[in-house]
């Protein structure tokens, strides 16, 4: 294999965070365009549009999840904080990152410094022991607010008040040295005692400030917590959502399936007669309802429950259009069956996985015409690819 060219990160290619950093960005876009064209060329009459590049291709990630680890230096074990290597055998002690926001890299360095100075033990997955499991950091692009999450293996931590004060102090010092204008508005402890690969647990304790950052999409205000689903590349959100808006017919009843905190529902509300958002996560539904009230939007209604359990009833509300934004697994067979047998005239499908989109598109074209697909690069320097597809009757 040829050695990487244009290498611009000391951890590449060992780090598993990026897999295309050695390729120029324009060439990456070309490869992703070709991937979509090759994968979807079998659909007759399908318009495959040009990929939408990210306005920012470096330091674009405004959410960071990093595991704690340890490495041996002589006979001494030293705490590390970073990403897994590609073989998933150890944690790289991250010194830089070309895709995550600079302020979040600075905050991560401050947390590492704090953890080492306090002699806090990293979590040992095989033993199930140790305190520190992960950090989860979020930054709001509009307000420059930062939320810090420390995921622990224990609920009660002796001397928590002093630990919090010193952590906050270190973070402020590190940000000040970098002339950062970011504002740390909250430090949270998330407790996860399960032997699991899932990062966040269910219990959350506020150590300092509040449990969310304030973010904007266009003129809309949202509150983003540690576990909130929100696009990690804020520079592409409006480009993505405008594709939905562009093909959405005016004054129709719309079902927004997998709506999360209601970002799409509220973004398309001004063009719609009514929007029904479906979401199974209780916290997300509460946030969505709160956001609709805060933004003074009255033609959006949110229903808690799995899409499979709520979609049929929502479609009976004389719905004309369905917006889909499922997880990487795509749609289950029964959900597709409900859509195929519905009176819906249009489906707008936001996908983060071309493989499952292809599988679902083959099924959906039994009743719908696959009109167009627009790839959107939300994740430069990685193989991940988002897209918006339009299906009509």
Curated annotation (Swiss-Prot):
Sequence positions that bind [4Fe-4S] cluster: 9, 15, 18, 97
Claim: Transferase is one of the keywords in the record: yes
Entry-linked Gene3D superfamilies: 2.40.50.1070, Vaccinia Virus protein VP39
InterPro entries registered for this protein in UniProt: MeTrfase_TrmA_AS, MeTrfase_TrmA_CS, SAM-dependent_MTases_sf, U5_MeTrfase_fam
SUPFAM superfamilies, alphabetized: S-adenosyl-L-methionine-dependent methyltransferases (SSF53335)
PROSITE patterns noted in UniProt: SAM_MT_RNA_M5U, TRMA_1, TRMA_2
Sites where the protein binds S-adenosyl-L-methionine: 231, 258, 279, 325
GO biological process terms, semicolon-separated: rRNA base methylation
EC number(s) on file: 2.1.1.-
Keywords: 4Fe-4S, Iron, Iron-sulfur, Metal-binding, Methyltransferase, S-adenosyl-L-methionine, Transferase
Active site per database record: 352
GO MF terms, alphabetically ordered: 4 iron, 4 sulfur cluster binding; metal ion binding; rRNA (uridine-C5-)-methyltransferase activity
Iron-sulfur listed as a keyword: yes
UniProt record similarity statement: Belongs to the class I-like SAM-binding methyltransferase superfamily. RNA M5U methyltransferase family.
Protein name: Uncharacterized RNA methyltransferase LA_0292
């Amino acid at each position: 294999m040829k050695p990487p060219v244009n290498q611009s990160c000391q951890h590449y290619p060992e780090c598993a965070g990026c897999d295309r950093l050695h390729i120029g960005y324009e060439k990456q876009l070309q490869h992703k365009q070709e991937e979509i064209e090759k994968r979807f060329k079998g659909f007759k009459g399908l318009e495959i549009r040009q990929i939408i590049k990210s306005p920012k291709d470096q330091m674009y990630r405004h959410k960071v999840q990093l595991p704690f680890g340890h490495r041996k230096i002589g006979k001494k074990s030293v705490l590390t904080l970073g990403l897994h290597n590609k073989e998933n055998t150890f944690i790289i002690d991250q010194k830089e990152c070309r895709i995550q926001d600079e302020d979040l890299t600075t905050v991560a360095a401050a947390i590492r410094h704090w953890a080492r100075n306090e002699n806090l033990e990293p979590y040992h997955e095989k033993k199930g022991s140790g305190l520190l499991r992960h950090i989860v950091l979020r930054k709001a692009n509009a307000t420059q607010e930062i939320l810090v999450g420390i995921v622990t293996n224990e609920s009660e931590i002796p001397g928590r008040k002093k630990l919090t004060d010193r952590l906050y102090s270190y973070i402020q010092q590190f940000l000040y040295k970098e002339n950062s204008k970011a504002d740390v508005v909250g430090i949270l402890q998330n407790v996860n005692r399960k032997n699991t690969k899932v990062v966040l647990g269910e219990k959350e304790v506020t150590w300092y400030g509040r449990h969310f950052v304030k973010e904007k999409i266009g003129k809309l205000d949202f509150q983003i917590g540690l576990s909130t689903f929100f696009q990690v590349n804020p520079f592409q959100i409006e480009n993505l959502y405008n594709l939905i808006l562009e093909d959405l017919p005016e004054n129709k009843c719309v079902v927004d399936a997998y709506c999360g905190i209601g970002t799409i529902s509220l973004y398309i509300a001004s063009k719609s007669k009514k929007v029904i958002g479906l979401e199974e996560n209780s916290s997300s539904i509460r946030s969505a309802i709160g956001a609709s009230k805060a933004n003074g939007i009255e033609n959006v209604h949110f229903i808690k429950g799995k899409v499979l359990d709520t979609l049929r009833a929502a479609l009976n509300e004389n719905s004309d259009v369905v917006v889909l934004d499922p997880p990487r697994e795509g749609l289950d067979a029964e959900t597709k069956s409900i859509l195929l047998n519905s009176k819906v005239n249009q489906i707008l499908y936001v996908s983060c996985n071309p493989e499952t989109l292809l599988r679902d598109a083959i099924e959906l074209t039994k009743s719908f015409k696959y009109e167009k697909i627009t790839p959107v690069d939300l994740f430069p320097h990685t193989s991940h690819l988002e897209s918006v597809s339009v299906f009509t009757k």
